[in-house]
């Protein structure tokens, strides 16, 4: 009888632990697109292919069973000069509501890197805590503005927002490579498109999903192991990162290309501009 009780207790403990394991529904939210189509040769190094391709701009929403609503990058949130090159910027508010999430419900924002299209922040998510690499933060708030620095891909307003968030205690440096920074969300840091960009492996109900934002520029880059023409500090490191991504998932379909409009034909469309990866 005692043995039976122990078996039952062990089973209940296992079931309880399983029910408490953090997992997420992963959504892709489109908020803008390039005004004109592009070609492979314009987007990928070492190719002369002229395949036509359309570029969309997206962020990722992770809806957890643990009360977490996490954005991976935060997109354009107010007008900047670069906006003239984009169509249909919707500032995410309406798109978020389609997923039954309000801006104030966002608990965390994880920045893959610091380009203007990834974090143009203006208090749109008042309760969000922001995660960024320390080296990334230091480079984009200090070093890049010194002589010889590179800062063309972001603007001073969003940089100041990062500084304000840090001063206000709403920013954490996420340098723990290979570890969970939030339950069910594991961080990887590897040289790639930008300054040691961050990549995430997110636990969903059925599979691990790899999120690299637009570090995985287009499916052409992923399929042909081709570095992008724009923003890659090291083409060799970028290609190594692509291989690392493939080793972390069971199926490459769970490596969404972060700016490829064809994503919306690869996964079920929840509604216009919103898809769920599953």
Regions found by a protein language model. Give the residues of each.
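Active-site neighborhood of phospho(di)ester-bond hydrolases with catalytic His/Asp-centered motifs
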Residues: 71-74, 107-113, 132-133, 190-192, ...
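Conserved beta-strand hairpin/beta-sheet module of binuclear metal-dependent hydrolase folds
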Residues: 30-94, 199-216
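Metallo-beta-lactamase
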Residues: 95-101, 105, 135-189, 233-252
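Beta-strand-turn-beta hairpins that frame and shape the catalytic cleft
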Residues: 20-26, 63-69, 178-186, 204-209
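Cap/insert and terminal regions of metallo-dependent hydrolase folds
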Residues: 86, 197, 201-278
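Active-site metal-binding motif and surrounding structural segment of the metallo-beta-lactamase
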Residues: 85-132, 251
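Short, electropositive alpha-helical surface patch
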Residues: 89-93, 124, 129-134, 188-193, ...
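Bacterial Sec-dependent N-terminal signal peptides
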Residues: 1-22
């Amino acid at each position: 009888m005692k043995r039976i009780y122990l078996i039952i207790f062990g089973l209940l403990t296992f079931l309880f632990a399983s029910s408490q394991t953090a997992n997420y529904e992963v959504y892709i939210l489109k908020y803008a697109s390039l005004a004109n189509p592009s070609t492979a040769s314009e987007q990928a190094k070492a190719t002369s292919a002229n395949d036509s391709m359309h570029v969309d701009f997206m962020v990722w929403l992770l809806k957890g069973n643990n009360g977490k609503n996490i954005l991976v990058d935060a997109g354009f949130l107010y007008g900047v000069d670069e906006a003239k090159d984009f169509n249909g910027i919707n500032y995410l508010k309406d798109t978020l509501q389609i997923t039954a999430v309000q801006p104030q419900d966002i608990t965390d924002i994880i920045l893959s890197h610091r380009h203007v299209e990834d974090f143009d922040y203006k208090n749109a998510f008042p309760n969000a805590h922001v995660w960024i690499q320390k080296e990334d933060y230091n480079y984009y708030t200090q070093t890049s503005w010194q002589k010889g620095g590179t800062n063309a891909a972001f603007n001073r307003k969003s940089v100041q927002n990062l500084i304000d968030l840090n001063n206000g205690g709403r920013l954490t440096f996420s340098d723990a490579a290979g570890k969970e920074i939030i339950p069910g969300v594991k961080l990887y840091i590897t040289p790639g498109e930008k300054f040691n960009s961050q990549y995430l492996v997110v636990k969903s109900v059925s599979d691990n999903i790899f999120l690299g934002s637009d570090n995985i520029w287009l499916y052409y880059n992923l399929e042909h192991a081709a570095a992008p023409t724009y923003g890659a500090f090291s083409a060799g490191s970028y290609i190594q990162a692509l291989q690392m991504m493939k080793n972390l998932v069971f199926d490459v379909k769970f490596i969404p290309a972060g700016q490829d409009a064809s994503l919306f034909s690869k996964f079920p469309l929840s509604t216009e501009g919103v898809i769920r990866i599953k």
